[in-house]
Amino acid sequence: TVTHDQDEALSMASRIAVMNKGDIAQLAEPSDLYEHPANRFVADFIGSVNIFEGKLTVDEPEQAMVDCPELGRVFLNHGVTGAHETTVWVAIRPEKITMLPAGRAKAKDSPSGTNIAQGQIKGMSYLGDVTIYDIRLDSGRSIRVSRPNLSRWDQEEFSWDDKVSLHWHPSSPVVLLS
């Protein structure tokens, strides 16, 4: 079956082919496409994603580090198998980012100074089950964060122009080599 409806494809298919200019960019199970995209095209095509350019500074079997000028230092609890000191892209899904009032975020399971960013809420979209936040990072770059509305009052916790801290687990980002 051919479809352009991502929700339909992800829910019905056991394998999905993502095409780019007539070529298969990736053929995989739906969860693999979403959680482990092969490249920036697939990451951006499937769902919503924040992508930041950086330099791979550490790449060992159990850990990796990417320095992203617009996001900060990103620690991963697994290796990347890329060339050390090369340009890579860090992809992180909006739902994998935790948002707290400014100064309260602490990246668990990560070295100090990694997997954390500061910013200010510049947009909010209440969608019923989730609220989507557009955050302007201190670097000036925007990042999207989604939070489930677990109770009727969750949406009141944050408002426009609030300063916030963001953090993410070291297994959440995906490093893309192309």
State each model region's role.
Residues 49, 58-178:
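Non-catalytic connector elements of ABC transporters
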